[in-house]
Amino acid sequence: DALGNRNSLLHGGWDDWPWHGIALGAHVARLFSILLGATTVVFAYRTARLLAPRQRAAAVLAAALVAFTPQFLFISASVSNDNMVTAVCAAGVWLSVALACGRVTLRWEALAALGLLVGLAALSKLSGLLLGPFALLCLGLAAWRGRAQGQSWRLLVGGGAVILGVAASVAGWWYWRNWQLYVDPLGLSA
């Protein structure tokens, strides 16, 4: 049938409990995907708490909107790279907002963690590259907040270098490989 993208799996005796081989691998991968979906919901809640600290109901609503979106539930229960990029981006958005709001100290450890999240997002899926500009924008807001101490340029340049350096060390090899193979770092011409 040409309607929709219907994925199917043939079931047989090899799929019975106790799982082994491919069936075990598929169930482990689905469990990992479900954990990534739960991570996304947790970070949606935590980000909403940062943005509206006195309104716990808003954070619960934000988490519920994510958790009970039918397509999110469907994808979270399947094996897909979408689960990794949403979980990593949700954590990256939370950390970026926490830095911008001053809830997390602008230390190199936090900036390196944000760079790691940006790199993992960029490695998981092409749309994960968008976490990088958001993280740098939030770093800019944090630097602007620190301008009273005369640190704004140092924070912006140094922090940006840490974030981009760690992100490049995590994901840069993939884009370099694409450039070498396809003369296209995004691999869109392959």
Each PLM stretch: what is its role?
Residues 31-52, 91:
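Transmembrane-helix motifs of polytopic, lipid-linked glycan transferases
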Residues 1-32, 190:
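Interfacial juxtamembrane loops and adjacent helix segments
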Residues 2-17, 44-68:
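Transmembrane-helix signature of polytopic, membrane-embedded enzymes
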Residues 29-36, 64-68, 72-96, 108, ...:
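Multi-pass, polyprenyl lipid-linked donor-dependent membrane glycosyltransferases
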Residues 71, 112, 116-144, 168-176:
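Transmembrane helices and adjacent periplasmic/lumenal helix-loop junctions
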Residues 60, 95-119, 124, 153-154:
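Short hydrophobic alpha-helices at membrane interfaces in multi-pass membrane enzymes
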Residues 100-101, 131-165:
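Perimembrane helix-loop-helix junctions
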Residues 158-190:
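Membrane-lumen/periplasm interface segments of specific transmembrane helices
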